[in-house]
């Protein structure tokens, strides 16, 4: 089975696909009852299993269930989890929710919200030969025609992710004398990188990774907490869909850390890749260029919905550039007008330095693609990593080249990427500190920038995945 996931998680060409119901090495814990003795297993005609005790009493046995979370927390394979994700998070699932809304009784409908990433918007703009602003408005028009209630831009959520990353770096820099694991701080927005770190390097690498949530998951907090309150709804009454450049975002949305136990709902219910949205357009017989534009929705009255916005610093969110500028000013009182990148081994590994009187004060880097990530990890393990901060992304060339982006039917890949980069950069940029509505939400929704509530809703944690050495994992 060919996997549609990005190359970030496919470290070899080996296809380890197993159907979730066929074989699995996940051990199941069974509580042993004292003095239970020997029992027999009886199989009924319908395939159900009964335990027959020595005293003649029988008890139906529960089937062992392997959930998506079990798959994600297991180092046995990757593709089983991918298979489940493809069925649980697809444009067909969105269709089901929209169709259910059409026949639901008043008050039983779910509010459907779609949050679109700037990278996906740029990819669609290149395909339909539109600019990014027109694409955003026409995409809003399309979603609302098929039954979606609100369409937002995830760039607004990225303001919070960038601001939290900035603050966290400054705090770590000031604490580096007391902690060997404070620096380098590694960016946390890429789920392919996070999955690799948790499963391959575990407790060694995780302390270095920023705890700031990615824009997708900040958007999840905004929609299922702030926006739900504004709409006088509980989180489970909202169906939240994100449109992302990468299949690995489906893995991120499925993490238990982003699941609301009280209301039994995820912060992001469904992740669609750019390609899946294009497929949805095709199935509906709609060309984006022919639709009438409709303004995006704003999360608050102070947030303008007239046009989409973005940030400086490249197509992966600009984490290095924003953290670098903030740290230079906050730690050394130096205003940085332009950030100059110095290519190192290749175009996907570049350095940025802050110097004063010949002394290097800050040394940052971008590391895109697993070859560069592996080199970075090896430097860390040898204690020879010279960097204070690294913007890490699993995909070569970063998020604009994500595995879920549209491929060119008649254009060379590099040429298409350049076109997508150009369209992405044409959108008006703003500093996260100055973005309308951000400080308002920090005060009224999060109860302050350094509050426990802000920490809970804007940060996350990571979990080392213990490798299971089991004979059951050997395929003879």
Curated annotation (Swiss-Prot):
Residue positions binding [4Fe-4S] cluster 1: 24, 71, 74, 77
Matching SMART domains: Fe_hyd_SSU
Gene Ontology MF terms: 4 iron, 4 sulfur cluster binding; metal ion binding
Domain of life of the native organism: Eukaryota
PANTHER family given in the database record: NITRATE, FORMATE, IRON DEHYDROGENASE
Family listed: Belongs to the NARF family.
Subunit structure: External component of the CIA complex. In the CIA complex, interacts directly with CIAO1 and MMS19.
Protein name stated in the entry: Cytosolic iron-sulfur assembly component 3
């Amino acid at each position: 089975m060919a996997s549609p996931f990005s190359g970030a998680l496919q470290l070899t060409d080996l296809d380890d696909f197993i159907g979730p119901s066929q074989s699995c090495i996940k051990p199941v814990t069974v509580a042993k009852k004292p003095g239970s003795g020997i029992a027999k297993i009886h199989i009924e005609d319908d395939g159900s299993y009964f335990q027959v005790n020595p005293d003649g009493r029988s008890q139906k046995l529960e089937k062992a269930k392997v959930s998506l979370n079990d798959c994600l927390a297991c180092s046995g394979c990757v593709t089983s989890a991918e298979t489940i994700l493809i069925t649980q998070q697809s444009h067909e699932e969105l269709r089901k929710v929209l169709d259910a809304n059409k026949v639901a009784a008043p008050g039983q409908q779910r509010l459907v919200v779609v949050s679109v990433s700037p990278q996906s918007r740029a990819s669609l703009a290149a395909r339909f030969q539109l600019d990014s602003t027109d694409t955003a408005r026409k995409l809003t028009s399309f979603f609302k025609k098929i039954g979606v209630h609100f369409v937002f831009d995830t760039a607004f959520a990225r303001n919070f992710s960038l601001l939290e990353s900035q603050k966290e770096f400054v705090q770590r820099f000031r604490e580096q004398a007391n902690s060997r694991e404070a620096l380098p701080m590694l960016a946390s927005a890429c789920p392919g990188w996070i999955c690799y770190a948790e499963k391959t390097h575990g407790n060694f690498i995780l302390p270095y990774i920023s705890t700031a949530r990615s824009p997708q998951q900040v958007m999840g907090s905004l929609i299922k907490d702030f926006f739900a309150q504004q709409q006088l709804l509980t989180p489970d009454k909202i169906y939240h869909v994100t449109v992302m450049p990468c299949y690995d975002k489906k893995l991120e949305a499925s993490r238990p850390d982003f699941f609301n136990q009280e209301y039994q709902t995820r912060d992001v219910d469904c992740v669609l890749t750019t390609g899946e949205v294009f497929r949805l357009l095709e199935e509906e017989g709609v060309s984006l260029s022919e639709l009438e534009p409709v303004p995006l929705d704003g999360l608050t009255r102070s947030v303008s919905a007239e046009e989409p916005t973005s940030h400086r610093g490249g197509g992966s969110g600009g984490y290095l550039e924003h953290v670098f500028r903030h740290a230079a000013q906050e730690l050394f009182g130096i205003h940085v007008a332009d950030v100059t990148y110095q290519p190192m081994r290749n175009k996907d590994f570049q350095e940025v330095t802050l110097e004063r009187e010949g002394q290097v004060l800050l040394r940052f880097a971008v590391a895109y693609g697993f070859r560069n990530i592996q080199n970075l990890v090896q430097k860390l393990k040898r204690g020879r990593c010279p960097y204070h901060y690294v913007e890490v992304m699993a995909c070569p060339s970063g998020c604009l080249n994500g595995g879920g982006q549209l491929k060119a039917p008649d254009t060379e890949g590099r040429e298409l990427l350049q076109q997508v980069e150009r369209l992405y950069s044409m959108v008006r940029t703003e500093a996260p500190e100055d973005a309308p509505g951000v400080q308002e939400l920090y005060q009224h929704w999060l109860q302050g920038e350094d509050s426990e509530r802000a920490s809970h809703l804007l940060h996350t944690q990571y979990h080392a995945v213990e490798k299971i050495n089991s004979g059951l994992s050997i395929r003879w």
